[in-house]
C-alpha cells in the first residue's frame, strides 16, 4: 500500500512533464519552422552579371526585397522566368550557386526574401510567405512575363510556398526541390511520441495540393537527404498529375549542388517538357 502514493506521484510527474513538453512544442513552433537571417552576406552583383535589386510590396503592404537576374538577350529561353522560393533558413544571399545553376538553363531568375528575412520587412508566417510569393509573381507579370512563362521553383519549405502559388495563380511549371509533404508529417517523424498533427498551426501541406494542380512538375530529391527523407519527394511525386518528372539529386539536404551539372541536367530535361521552352 505504501507504494501506491509513490507510484501516483511518479505518474503525475511523468504526465506533467509530458504536458510541459507539449506546451513548449506549441510555444516554440514558429522558431522551429522559421530561421531567418537579416544579414546579407553578398549582393546580386557577386554573380558578375546584370541584376536588379528590387523593392516591392505584398498585398498587405509589407515591403519585400528581391534580386532579378535577366537572361541573356540571345537565349532561346529569355522569355521564361524562374521564381525562386528559398527554404526556411538564411536569406537570398546564401543561394548564389543555385542562381548560377538556374541561369545556366537560359531563363531569367527572380529570387526574393519572405517577410522577416534579409531586407524584407515584418515577421514570417505561413500565409505571409504565400502573400510574398504572390507579390513576387505579380512583379514578374508587371515585368512583362505572362503567367504561363513563369516557373515557380521551391527549395525545401519554399516548395510548400511554390505549390500554394501554383494553386492560386497561373504558372508554366512547378519545381519542388527537397520538399517535405507537410510540416505535420515532418513533425510526426521528428517527434513520434507527441501529438504534433493536432497541435501545429503551421502546415505547408504540399502533397494535398498537388492532385488539384494542372501544371508541369519537376520533383528533385536526394536519396541521401538526411533532413527531408527521400520518401517525401516520392510521395509528392505520386500525388501529382502528369506531366511530371522525378530527378534524383546527389548530396545531402543542404548540398543539392553536390553535382552541379547533374542538377542542371534535371532542369534542362524538365524544361524540354514545357511547351515552348
Language-model features: locations:
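Primarily recognizes the serine-hydrolase "nucleophile elbow" in alpha/beta-hydrolase
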Residues: 136-143, 147-193, 209
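Catalytic active-site module of serine/aspartate enzymes centered on a nucleophile-bearing elbow/loop
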Residues: 260-277
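Acidic catalytic loop of the alpha/beta-hydrolase fold
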Residues: 223-228, 253-255
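Catalytic histidine-centered segment of alpha/beta-hydrolase-like enzymes
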Residues: 252-262
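Short beta-strand/loop motif that positions the catalytic acidic residue
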Residues: 212-214, 219-221, 225
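Membrane-embedded segments
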Residues: 59-139, 143, 148
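Short alpha-helix in the alpha/beta-hydrolase fold that links the catalytic acid
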Residues: 98, 206, 215, 229-238
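An N-terminal hydrophobic leader/cap segment in hydrolases
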Residues: 10-57
Amino acid at each position: 500500500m505504501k507504494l501506491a502514493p509513490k507510484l501516483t506521484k511518479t505518474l503525475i510527474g511523468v504526465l506533467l512533464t509530458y504536458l510541459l513538453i507539449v506546451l513548449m512544442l506549441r510555444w516554440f513552433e514558429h522558431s522551429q519552422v522559421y530561421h531567418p537571417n537579416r544579414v546579407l552576406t553578398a549582393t546580386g552583383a557577386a554573380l558578375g552579371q546584370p541584376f536588379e535589386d528590387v523593392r516591392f510590396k505584398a498585398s498587405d503592404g509589407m515591403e519585400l526585397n528581391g534580386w532579378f537576374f535577366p537572361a541573356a538577350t540571345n537565349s532561346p529561353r529569355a522569355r521564361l522566368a524562374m521564381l525562386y522560393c528559398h527554404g526556411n533558413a538564411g536569406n537570398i544571399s546564401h543561394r548564389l550557386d543555385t542562381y548560377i545553376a538556374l541561369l545556366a538553363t537560359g531563363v531569367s531568375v527572380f529570387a526574393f526574401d519572405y517577410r522577416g528575412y534579409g531586407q524584407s520587412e515584418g515577421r514570417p508566417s505561413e500565409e505571409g510567405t504565400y502573400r510574398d510569393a504572390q507579390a513576387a509573381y505579380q512583379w514578374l507579370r508587371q515585368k512583362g512575363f505572362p503567367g504561363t512563362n513563369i516557373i515557380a521553383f521551391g527549395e525545401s519549405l519554399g516548395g510548400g510556398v511554390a505549390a500554394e502559388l501554383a494553386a492560386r495563380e497561373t504558372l508554366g511549371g512547378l519545381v519542388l526541390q527537397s520538399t517535405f509533404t507537410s510540416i505535420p508529417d515532418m513533425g510526426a517523424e521528428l517527434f513520434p511520441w507527441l501529438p504534433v498533427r493536432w497541435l501545429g498551426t503551421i502546415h505547408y501541406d504540399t502533397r494535398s495540393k498537388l492532385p488539384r494542380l494542372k501544371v508541369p512538375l519537376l520533383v528533385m530529391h536526394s536519396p541521401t537527404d538526411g533532413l527531408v527523407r527521400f520518401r517525401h519527394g516520392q510521395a509528392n511525386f505520386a500525388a501529382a498529375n502528369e506531366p511530371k518528372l522525378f530527378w534524383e539529386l546527389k548530396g545531402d539536404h543542404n548540398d543539392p549542388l553536390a553535382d552541379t551539372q547533374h542538377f542542371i541536367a534535371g532542369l534542362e530535361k524538365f524544361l524540354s517538357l514545357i511547351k515552348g521552352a
